[in-house]
Amino acid sequence: MILSGKEILKNIGSNIIIEPFDEKKINPNSYNLSLHNELLVYENDILDMKTPNPTKVIKIPEDGLLLEPGKLYLGRTNEFTSTSKYVPMLEGRSSTGRLGLFIHVTAGFGDIGFSGYWTLEIFCVQPIKVYPNVEICQIYYHDIHGEYDLYSSGKYQNNKGIQPSLMYKDFEK
């Protein structure tokens, strides 16, 4: 079952951490998250799953940055989130989707116990200008039933910024 906005609010500071938190960003069953002012792009046209892929940082100026179609941009939320009782999920806002802007390519599902900033896999279908601090996506929470272990040792846990793919670590096992 998805938590209502009122239930999210009741759990803030205990089972759900969102920092910084602004009550005005609560929706009927989600909370809006905003875009940080930096993006990462991969430097190479061909990416290799088995090796770290070099990236470069792009700053989003206050007057906006024009994104190009066919290019993957990695961003992150301004908000740090943590959950100990609910499964977090991330979705783009309908307003961004209607502009042809995808906020996550495949990674909208979080694990119970995840703590960190959300890395956004941003892709657009036509050129679009984006701005820092825009409310770009929303987080919502599911109940979990049955026994579970908290996510605590994943490669993206407690991240401090934008996380490029660390899939190469899966090959090191």
Curated annotation (Swiss-Prot):
MF (Gene Ontology): dCTP deaminase (dUMP-forming) activity; dCTP deaminase activity; nucleotide binding
InterPro entries: dCTP_deaminase, dUTPase-like_sf, dUTPase_trimeric
Enzyme Commission identifier(s): 3.5.4.30
Enzyme class, broadest EC rank: hydrolase
Source taxon at top rank: Bacteria
Pfam families in alphabetical order: DCD
CDD domains found in the cross-reference section: trimeric_dUTPase (cd07557)
Active-site residues, Swiss-Prot/TrEMBL: 121 (proton donor/acceptor)
Record-marked site positions (Important for bifunctional activity): 108-109
Catalytic reaction equation(s): dCTP + 2 H2O = dUMP + NH4(+) + diphosphate
Pathway(s): Pyrimidine metabolism; dUMP biosynthesis; dUMP from dCTP: step 1/1
A GO biological-process term: dUTP biosynthetic process
Protein family: Belongs to the dCTP deaminase family.
PANTHER family: DCTP DEAMINASE
Function noted in UniProt: Bifunctional enzyme that catalyzes both the deamination of dCTP to dUTP and the hydrolysis of dUTP to dUMP without releasing the toxic dUTP intermediate.
HAMAP family: dCTP_deaminase (MF_00146)
Complex and partners: Homotrimer.
NCBIfam families documented for this protein: dCTP_deam
Protein's UniProt name: dCTP deaminase, dUMP-forming
Native organism: Clostridium beijerinckii (strain ATCC 51743 / NCIMB 8052)
Designated gene of the protein: dcd
